Amino acid sequence: MELDLEICRTIAIRYGLPLQFVFKEFCLMDVISQIAAITAREPGSLVFKGGTALNKAYLQKMQRFSEDADFDLVTKNSDKELYRFSKKLASEINGYMITELRRVRYTMQFYCMYGTPLGGEDHVRIDISSKRLRTAKPLENNMIISEFTHSSVSGIPIYSIEDLTARKMHALADRAEGKDLYDVHMALPMCSNKVLKTAIEFMLKSEGEEEAVDSFVQRSIARLKKSDPKKMRNLTNPFIPSASRPKSWEELKNDLLAMLEDFRAGL
């Protein structure tokens, strides 16, 4: 994809994002657009998920920058089918140097390499997992929108806000990174608590974990309490437009803890 340096610089200044992030945003949206066109021939087989899906489809003007795109391939957990699909998809993406497929646990991963206007090289990472479809709500067909490049993509099924938030809460419980805190804090008020509880139940089954919702939320709270807000701020602020950056990550953390406690109390 050809990138216009001056346009990218203007966007970087406007949103307070690093220039290389703006380069990647254009390429990320381009790759997602190509994937939408390629998979339109097999509707319903690929579902958009993860932080990029949550931010681009639901958080809108509060969205942060995202580095990669994650998808679930709806199968009966066939490794051969996952490999075949991923290899075919990678071969049909144009305008990038595509790396060899590699398996990372239960996921097939490849990189779409591109050159930047400054002479450097970067990539968009694509992760595809094989999953059975277990959702609290039907899949959505929301427009995927970049507030930074003002580009949009349609045609890829996406999990509901509750199903995406349940998966983000799983990431929060496991690693409690700043991106997870930001995403869950922004998404939780948009969720129906009743639907979210069901979404967490299905998510835990999908991950092969035998755990009650109450126990899972307790674990998320405990993990978040141990997190370092200063470290979160330093690592995550570059991914958030300057106008949307939390004034205090300590307050953001405490606010989310209160929200999670309220959610748990209503279970």
Name each region found by the language model.
Residues 51:
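Active-site glycine-centered loops adjacent to acidic/histidine catalytic or metal-binding residues
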Residues 1-46, 56-69, 73-267:
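Structured mid-to-C-terminal alpha-helical surface segments
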